[in-house]
A protein has these predicted regions:
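Covalent nucleotidyltransferase
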Residues: 1-284
Length: 284
């Protein structure tokens, strides 16, 4: 059976619009973009804006849409990019607080009152307290005035919010900030690759097939990421998903304790399986 998918490049204002919500599932990695990656992103966007370029392409994301949970898109690949964009937009809203379109890109709003209904991006990842940290920094009442340079023990959400905050403060003209916001909303774009399924499991399985061949901002996907997603899907089918997540987290913690990369385990496992099955083609 062929794989049916939808792929259409969209600007940020169209990505985060309507009733669409993005769900980062439990099996995904914790947020990991650091100063270097965030600085590269904001510098590229500012340079593109300064040069008045026609647009700025942010890359691909892979999402699964099931008919039984329509408009709740499970993020298979691109969670780091979507999370970082949301952090950037939250900082920009502090400087451009009356921008309803920007506000609506961070949260779903009531059509009549513009009151916040819920965030457009929600993470179910519980490793490293991702849920709590993310909720804290995108909260409408987050105190930007109290922001201080984070120490080494601060979480990545706070560190990256502070980085974006200091970078935007360098744009001293309010009109220029507003124009920069408009550039991001209407000129920056993503390519969402979306698979459809009658239920969550079938939509996810299709998306995982794409996931195996897509790179995340130029970084090859780890063997462990692919195994984790596939094993999670199997566990979900037999209602063992929470048990799997706990077991995986324990495995990861044990690897950290003995200073072993979890991906090395699955690279070895993949090598063994290929040998047992007589596969001689070069490994990717």
């Amino acid at each position: 059976m062929g794989l049916t998918l939808n792929a259409e490049q969209k600007n940020i204002s169209n990505i985060f619009s309507g009733r669409i919500k993005f769900i980062i599932p439990e099996y995904q990695r914790p947020y990991s973009w650091d100063k270097e990656e965030c600085l590269e992103l904001i510098d590229d966007l500012k340079q593109s804006f300064k040069n008045e370029e026609d647009g700025y392409f942010l890359g691909n994301i892979v999402v699964a849409n099931s008919l039984d949970e329509n408009n709740q898109l499970e993020v298979i690949d691109g969670q780091q990019r979507l999370t970082t964009l949301t952090l950037l937009m939250r900082v920009l809203l502090y400087f451009d607080s009356s921008n309803i379109k920007l506000r609506n890109s961070i949260w779903e709003l009531d059509d009549r009152t513009n009151d916040i209904i819920e965030p457009r991006l929600f993470t179910k990842v519980f490793s490293n307290q991702d849920q709590e940290y993310f909720k804290e920094v995108i909260d409408l009442n987050f105190d930007f005035e109290a922001l201080k340079e984070p120490n080494v023990n601060c979480n990545l959400y706070i560190k990256n919010v502070y980085l974006f905050y200091t970078e935007i403060k360098k744009i001293r003209n309010n009109i220029e900030i507003q124009n920069f916001v408009d550039y991001i909303l209407y000129k920056a774009s993503l390519l969402p690759i979306q698979t459809e399924g009658t239920n969550k499991e079938s939509a996810r399985e299709k998306a995982l097939r794409i996931f195996e061949t897509i790179n995340d901002r130029g970084k090859s996907l780890n063997d462990s990421d692919i195994f984790k997603a596939k094993l999670y899907n199997k566990a979900l089918n037999i209602k063992k998903d929470q048990d799997f997540i706990l077991r995986w987290d324990n495995l990861n913690n044990e690897c950290i304790e003995i200073k072993l990369f979890i991906d090395d385990i699955f690279k070895l496992y993949t090598h063994i399986i290929r040998g047992e099955n007589g596969i001689k083609s070069p490994e990717s």
